[in-house]
């Protein structure tokens, strides 16, 4: 994206709209994931042909690049019509200016990502010697409740299971707000 901003390379963007230029100059992995499954993978069949609900779970940031804060967004201009279709199909309320409420299942997908990345990053830290097994167990103690003598896999498994239970409880507790599109926080209250 920095390459396109260099004066010698801006001519490559000459035929694009300002919004398309914004997409290219603010490349975002979340938007690319939607583009990839909706059109690039199995492109001859029109993408992976996932259900609207499956695509909805990918949308942590259901807005375009011009609405992005901190660079996070899910919709390139090339997927804007798809997003409008998904919003209509899934009943996602428009928040105006190419911005929609999140699909309720996106909160569960986000929590699953958080659980896996956080716990596996800690496990990797033990394996490469950055974190001791004692510190690993101590960090995950609120989720795992096992002794420091347990192996990494057991601690991970128990911590993931308990984190999932926590997410389910939070989802149930805030179900009405989630379904109304009013939740603006993570479901996982992770201890580390």
State what each model feature region is.
Residues 2-155, 164:
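Sequence-structural signature of the catalytic-core scaffold of metal-dependent phosphohydrolases
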């Amino acid at each position: 994206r920095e390459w396109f901003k260099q004066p010698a390379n801006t001519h490559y963007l000459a035929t694009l709209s300002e919004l398309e230029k914004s997409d290219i100059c603010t490349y975002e992995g979340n938007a690319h994931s939607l583009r990839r499954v909706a059109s690039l993978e199995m492109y001859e069949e029109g993408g992976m042909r996932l259900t609207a609900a499956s695509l909805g779970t990918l949308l942590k940031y259901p807005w375009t690049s011009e609405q992005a804060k901190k660079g996070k967004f899910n919709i390139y201009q090339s997927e804007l019509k798809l997003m409008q279709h998904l919003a209509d199909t899934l009943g996602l309320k428009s928040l105006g200016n190419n911005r929609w409420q999140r699909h309720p299942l996106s909160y569960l997908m986000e929590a699953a990502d958080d659980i896996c990345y956080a716990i596996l990053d800690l496990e990797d830290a033990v394996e490469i010697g950055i974190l001791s097994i004692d510190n690993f167990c101590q960090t995950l103690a609120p989720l795992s409740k096992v002794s420091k003598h347990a192996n990494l896999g057991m601690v991970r498994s128990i911590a993931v299971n308990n984190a999932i239970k926590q997410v389910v409880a939070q989802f149930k507790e805030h179900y009405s707000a989630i379904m109304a599109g009013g939740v603006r926080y993570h479901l996982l209250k992770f201890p580390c």
